[in-house]
Curated annotation (Swiss-Prot):
Record protein name field: Adenylate-forming reductase
InterPro entries attached to this UniProt entry: ACP-like_sf, Adenylate-forming_Reductase, AMP-binding_CS, AMP-dep_synth/lig_dom, ANL_N_sf, Far_NAD-bd, NAD(P)-bd_dom_sf
Domain of life: Eukaryota
Knockout consequences: Abolishes the production of 5-methyl orsellinic aldehyde and azasperpyranone A(AZA-A) but accumulates 5-methyl orsellinic acid.
Sequence positions that bind NADP(+): T693, G694, N695, L696, R719, N785, A786, W787, Y863, K867
UniProt-reported outcome of changing S612A: Abolishes the production of 2,4-dihydroxy 5,6-dimethyl benzaldehyde but accumulates 5-methylorsellinic acid
Entry GO MF terms: ATP binding; oxidoreductase activity
Gene3D superfamilies: ACP-like, N-terminal domain of ligase-like, NAD(P)-binding Rossmann-like Domain
Group of enzyme by EC: oxidoreductase
Organism, as annotated: Aspergillus terreus (strain NIH 2624 / FGSC A1156)
Family, per entry: Belongs to the adenylate-forming reductase family.
């Protein structure tokens, strides 16, 4: 292909005055800039859009002039007004205030169509949110809810993510989100050719310089979910001015390998509108790779390149005649979005490539200058703009690297300043404003492809486990992350400990974006007592110092990942079923979520939604199937070049030598295990108990072991850091845990206890065949009580719990197969949260002991949704396997032990009391409560488990209700609190203010985890508006029939126990 002809007529530049927006001759918005270019530069080329690749061929680019772009935007404006319900421009109210339409979300592939829609909505004065196409459904749902969006326009390929996000959203602000499918941009270009277009009305889209409800982008938030960032009109004008390009410098085309849904990607189109330098965009149906970019440069001969580090890194791995030589003629190669490896940059610079560093943030826009590098320029540094409001303060004049600075910027239209989190070094006195980043003050990790993530979800979930002292994610400049875990106690078997943590890592991954997941247990580094995780004097983790200390271990992690595992793949590259095996590999090994029946061997994997991390995992797996001497011929873009199973199969056959593969058949092993032995049924009960280390579980264990009918209680516990398998050690640890919760088990009862450590979500619990067979040979009753207590998690993050339940049901089923005379019993402990909305949907407070439906679950409460899913799994199992007796118990509010006073301080009401003690106030809570002490609850569960028959739904809550005011009066007395009856909402605000201002980090986290539940659901759930009917339970439980109210003596026990444990603290002042 030949170079693209570009209009060389002089480009008339519009007047832009960022620092003095009152300038009457200056344009005030990108919309006005659009119209200016249509009038003054109509035939100048704006953009060259390469069409979607067909059969691996690159077509000729679509040439779009400024006038054509303006016409397409105007046509799209009219079309959207007809298509989107409720779309309208700003409306002036009687009091002079302005009301805007709710934001419209753009969730699109990176092509010029995104720009057309963006400018169309902005010209209407409609707030527009641009979301990264790489976000997970959870992140998309969070953002749509945060900005109260009501409409979203999605590319056809991305509709599935939006549908999943909408389906999972029960939050009121985002109810009724309507999805519209993006039309091809070619339609807007074609249909606008003969359209009479009105001039843009400034008053219809421009409100004021400080109106930030114009463009909504997003970044990583402190909770690990993205946060919306609102920007004014000057934000995009800011992009258009980040240059020092003269008329000659603006000649030729810049190839942009940057996605338009990221801030960095807006640099090229905004510069095209200001200086007239056209930009070229790659096909939107393929992810840019080093080889693709080189192919485009060689085909169309642009004069400059804008890219991210990993593309340049890929380019340097290609043969020199195909790579670096193509970059050498370019006026500049602009690189930003993340750190570029020094070795790569040095190789490029030494070869004469004009590297140009760039820097910016979503909040501030571009901070670096785009220019053609001169001989005195040093590629290590980016040049700070001088047309923005900023302050550069020295923070360390004695650093070994040079003077360190912090940069504070006052973004255009903002009322407040924004401090850049990067630590910056200056090139020197002569080049003070030439800076480079040497680290970050926050926890943000920037991957090699420019993707950013905050790993707090992963780190927090790990550190909530009692076996983990600290967790630090790493991955800066790499393609994926790993995590350093510091165990609470010395670990004897590292691999077992990693396996035990893996379920937590997977749960975290379900809540994080696809690029932010840990791919393998081998990516977990265990800190040793000899090399603890570095901390400051205040005890906080020193992230960067941790990376330095564990530099060798981190390097080894990525070496192992690069080598991949030959045992994992086991592909026979000469097999006739290679394509079938490849599809199975994708389904099993890379986190693929699409059902096998929904895609074909010829389907484009990236069209189906394969992300960059999945492509990397697949690449590593495929490498292990090839002879060593063939692997070097498989570049990093191998999967991108062969983006379907059929193409991968053809490519692999071409590369492979004659090798035979082997695949194990786990189904055969399962069948053999089930039928290994047939044992004679015993008359005595053996109870398989889960969750035995919790408060309720410890009380259950103590009660069950006192029953004459119970011969043995098998505690199926999540495998922990203590890898001892000795029976005595395991039981002693179990007894110690129970004792820590005020539950003392005598030696005779303890002799009935057996402890089996396991991986709850692994097939057969990850147990050896003989141990699993031991379970099925003895178990007669299963009481499934285990459950993570976290009110912030969404339903998808409980996947391991659903697998846990299915594994237990398999035990019951296999028990029946091995011992036909046994009819196993299975009791699942559910929650009142499953029916929390029942009074609203059915018009009655008294909830019967019957199956519920989805409408009864508490809205936007993953805990309750997950319990509902488990109830439905139990009901389906009961229908399918009538030979098993299955029951469900929905538990209401349990309090601490009536005997010892132990009440887990992490539960919501003890935390509420902790907050009350901190602020010296008790809230006003009206109506009644129905607490049942945990020791009594354990007895009731046992009564139900051993009832004459077991089936259906039971409810467990105290039938005797007490006045909240009476109980709070006792707490006021025991806590010495004089300020009572503070309105609940006001009390919550007082707590929030005190915690945020004077609380510890742990206390702030406690509040964040519980605040939403207290605000939305506590008063409705806990004050008699939701009452569980206990008729069926009382019929089989004498304990529940005779239980009384929580006495004053018991309340005092709770407070004394919390004081003894140090949970309560003096009021914050």
């Amino acid at each position: 292909m030949s170079p693209i002809a570009i209009d060389t007529a002089p480009f008339q530049r519009a007047r832009v005055n960022l620092l003095h927006p009152e300038d009457p001759k200056a344009v005030k918005s990108i919309v006005q800039l659009l119209q200016f270019n249509a009038e003054h530069n109509p035939d100048h080329v704006f953009c060259l859009q390469l069409p979607s690749k067909q059969d691996d061929a690159i077509g000729n680019p679509i040439r779009i002039t400024h006038l054509q772009f303006y016409r397409a935007v105007s046509y799209c404006t009219q079309r959207l007004q007809e298509e989107i319900d409720g779309l309208h421009g700003p409306r002036v109210n009687e009091d002079g205030t302005v009301t805007k339409c709710s934001p419209v979300v753009l969730f699109m592939e990176s092509n010029v169509g995104l720009l057309i829609h963006l400018l169309a909505l902005m010209s209407l004065g409609v707030p527009v949110a641009v979301l990264s196409a790489r976000l997970s459904p959870t992140a998309v749902q969070h953002l749509m809810s945060s900005i109260r969006a009501q409409s979203v326009i999605a590319s056809p390929r991305l509709k599935g993510t939006i549908e999943e996000a909408i389906a999972s959203d029960n939050n009121t602000p985002a109810i009724g989100v309507r999805m519209y499918t993006q039309r091809p941009f070619e339609d807007d270009l074609e249909n606008s050719r003969t359209l009479d277009l009105p001039a843009t009305n400034e008053e219809s889209h421009f409100i004021s310089e400080n109106d930030r409800n114009v463009l909504i982008l997003h970044s990583s938030g402190t909770t690990g979910l993205p946060k919306p960032i609102y920007q004014p009109h000057r934000y995009l004008l800011n992009y258009s001015e980040c240059h020092e390009l003269g008329p000659d410098d603006a000649l030729g085309t810049v190839l942009s390998a940057l996605p338009l849904f990221h801030g960095f990607g807006l640099v090229a189109p905004c510069l095209a509108m200001t200086v007239g330098k056209p930009f070229m965009l790659p096909p939107s149906n393929t992810i840019p790779t080093g080889s693709l970019i080189i192919e485009l440069i060689q085909s169309f001969q642009p004069t400059a390149l804008m890219t991210v580090p990993h593309i340049l890194e890929e380019i340097t791995t290609l043969p020199p005649e195909q790579s670096i030589s193509a970059l050498q003629p370019l006026e500049f190669v602009l690189c930003g979005g993340g750190p570029l490896k020094i070795s790569v940059a040095e190789a490029l610079a030494a070869s004469g490539v004009n590297l140009l560093a760039h820097f910016g943030t979503t909040e501030t826009g571009p901070l670096g200058v785009v220019f053609v590098p001169t001989p005195d320029y040093d590629w290590h540094y980016w040049k700070l703009r001088q047309d923005i409001n900023y302050r550069l303060d020295e923070v360390d004049a004695n650093s070994a690297d040079g003077n360190q600075y912090k940069l504070t910027v006052h973004p255009f239209g903002w009322d407040s300043a924004f401090e850049i989190q990067d630590i910056l070094l200056s090139r020197g006195a002569e080049y003070k404003h030439h800076l480079r980043a040497v680290g970050r003050k926050d926890d943000l990790i920037v991957l090699a492809n420019g993707e950013k993530l905050v790993p707090r979800v992963l780190e927090t979930l790990l550190m909530q486990d009692e076996r983990v002292k600290s967790a630090v994610a790493f991955g800066e400049g790499k393609f994926e992350i790993g995590v350093i875990v510091e165990p609470t106690h010395k670990v004897s078997d590292e691999e077992d400990f990693k396996a035990a943590l893996w379920a937590i890592v997977l749960e975290a991954g379900a809540q994080m974006d696809s690029h932010a997941q840990v791919s393998s247990p081998s990516s977990i580094i265990l800190a040793t007592p000899e090399k603890p995780v570095p901390r400051s004097d205040k005890g906080s983790i020193l992230r960067r110092e941790t990376y330095r200390v564990y530099d060798e271990e981190i390097s080894r992690v990525y070496e192992v990942l690069d080598r991949a595992s030959e045992e994992t793949t086991a592909l026979n590259l000469q097999s006739d079923s290679l394509e079938e095996d490849l599809k199975d590999l994708i389904q099993r090994e890379i986190g693929w979520k699409i059902s096998p029946s929904e895609w074909l061997q010829d389907s484009d994997l990236f069209e189906l939604g394969m992300n960059s991390l999945q492509a990397i995992r697949l690449h590593r797996l495929l490498l292990s199937s090839l002879p060593v001497d063939s692997r070097e011929r498989v570049g990093a873009d191998f999967v991108y070049r062969s983006p379907s199973v059929s193409k991968l199969g053809a490519s692999l056959r071409h590369l492979a030598a004659n090798e035979n593969g082997h695949r194990n058949d786990p189904e055969t092993e399962i069948d053999e295990l089930i039928c290994l032995n047939s044992f004679i049924a015993r008359q005595d009960a053996t109870v398989l108990l889960t969750g035995s280390t919790g408060n309720l579980g410890s009380n259950l264990l103590a009660h069950l072991t006192t029953l004459p009918r119970v011969k043995k209680v098998i505690c199926l516990n999540r495998r922990g850091s203590d890898t001892s398998t000795a029976h005595t050690d395991l039981v002693e640890r179990q007894l110690a845990i129970a004792k820590s919760k005020g539950v003392v088990i005598d030696p005779e009862s303890a002799s009935k206890i057996e402890v089996i450590p396991c991986d709850p979500s692994a097939d057969f619990f990850g147990l050896p065949a003989e141990v699993y067979t031991h379970l099925t040979a003895q178990t007669t009753h299963i009481l499934h009580n285990a459950w993570p207590m976290d009110f912030k998690r969404n339903v998808a993050s409980f996947q391991s719990q659903f697998q846990y339940l299915n594994n237990l049901l398999r035990v019951a089923h296999d028990t029946r197969l091995c011992r036909p005379s046994i009819k196993p019993r299975f009791l699942f402990v559910s929650s009142i949260a499953v029916v929390g909305q029942y009074p609203r949907t059915h018009g009655t407070r008294l909830i019967p002991e019957v199956p519920s439906d989805k409408s009864s679950i508490i809205e936007d409460f993953g805990y309750g949704k997950a319990k509902y899913v488990c109830e439905e799994i139990m009901r389906a199992a009961a229908d399918r396997y009538p030979e098993m007796q299955l029951g469900i118990v929905r538990v209401g509010q349990m309090s601490g032990s009536s005997r010892t006073g132990y009440w887990n301080p992490k539960e919501h009401f003890p935390t509420l009391i902790k907050f009350a003690s901190m602020v010296g106030q008790l809230p006003a809570i009206k109506q009644t409560l129905s607490w049942i002490a945990v020791d009594n609850a354990a007895t009731v569960l046992s009564d139900i488990l051993f009832a004459p028959s077991l089936s259906g739904i039971y409810h467990l809550e105290n039938p005797i209700r007490q006045a909240w005011q009476d109980v709070l009066d006792i707490f006021a007395s025991s806590l010495y609190i004089n300020t009572v009856n503070v309105p609940f909402d006001q009390w919550l605000r007082n707590v929030q203010a005190a915690v945020q201002e004077l609380g510890t980090e742990d206390e702030r986290m406690e509040y964040d985890l519980l605040a939403e539940f207290l605000e939305k659901d506590f008063q409705r759930m806990a004050t008699g508006k939701v009452i569980l009917d206990t008729s069926r339970s009382r019929a089989v439980s004498e304990t529940l029939r005779e239980v009384g109210e929580i006495s004053e003596e018991v309340v005092w026990k709770y407070v004394r126990e919390w004081r003894r444990a140090g949970t309560l603290r003096a009021p914050l002042e």
